[in-house]
Amino acid sequence: MLIVKSSGKILKIIRESKNMSLKEVAAGDISVAQLSRYERGISSLTVDSFYSCLRNMSVSLAEFQYVYHNYREADDVVLSQKLSEAQRENNIVKLESILAGSEAMAQEFPEKKNYKLNTIVIRATLTSCNPDYQVSKGDIEFLTDYLFSVEEWGRYELWLFTNSVNLLTLETLETFASEMINRTQFYNNLPENRRRIIKMLLNVVSACIENNHLQVAMKFLNYIDNTKIPETDLYDRVLIKYHKALYSYKVGNPHARHDIEQCLSTFEYLDSFGVARKLKEQFERIQLTVVADLQIE
């Protein structure tokens, strides 16, 4: 496999910014002449040679991509950030604008499956903010068929599933979440993917708690408990504590309310008001169901 010639000029920009010579970057792994031709766009490099050059400059692939994309995140990362922000703000107008742009791309490039998948995820996000908005059965089948077809889930598949939890049946959620644990073995040691896995599982846990699928909720909470979460990942740790308390409250422990309120206060203290609002709305829904269950008893 070859690295395209056009990326050579980016490597040169990074090399010169580090005040390194061609010889230092080549470092005996490839010839100086070969590296020079690559930088000038005359020839390509093999993947192994390309990674050797990055390693010799102490540059990560993510850093290279950031420069390659003109000092901005990759398109899928930008889309993910925009969606998360609009969802936290409950900004339906912004979501509809993002959707319109994605639909246009999907129509212009029908052969590119990711544009259609992105569009489905945006529609799913809209439904989470506006229950009156519906996603077609065909879209849901297209998404699930794609996820089932991928043997090893990476960042993109985790993102797709995490943001479409509200579209799927509880049985499908359990199946996918269980499969996901097996299908991310290649990537789950990457910090970014580990965080995505935790986020995905917590979304599944939320859906299960709200729909009284409590055994499954406990199954995935136990899995999370056995996952080593770094102490510095405070956001994940507070979210996990919140969901464990929410489960406890749902199964009849009124004292869990204190832990829930502490988690909400923590997010508010950190000025994460959008997150706090979403979780508070969820807790209020759970409270109503608990009261209703007590009245039935």
Curated annotation (Swiss-Prot):
Keyword Transport: no
Subcellular location, principal: cytoplasm
SMART domains hit by this protein: HTH_XRE (SM00530)
Keywords assigned by UniProt, alphabetized: Cytoplasm, DNA-binding, Transcription, Transcription regulation
HTH cro/C1-type domain boundaries: 11-64
DNA bind region: 22-41
Gene Ontology molecular function, alphabetical: DNA binding
InterPro entries reported for this sequence: Cro/C1-type_HTH, HTH-type_regulator_Rgg, Lambda_DNA-bd_dom_sf, Transcription_activator_Rgg_C
Parts of the chain that traverse the membrane: none
One Pfam family it belongs to: HTH_3
Cellular component GO terms held in the UniProt record: cytoplasm
Cell location: Cytoplasm
PANTHER family: TRANSCRIPTIONAL REGULATOR, TRANSCRIPTIONAL REGULATOR-RELATED
Task performed by this protein: Regulates the expression of glucosyltransferase (gtfG).
Protein name per its UniProtKB record: HTH-type transcriptional regulator rgg
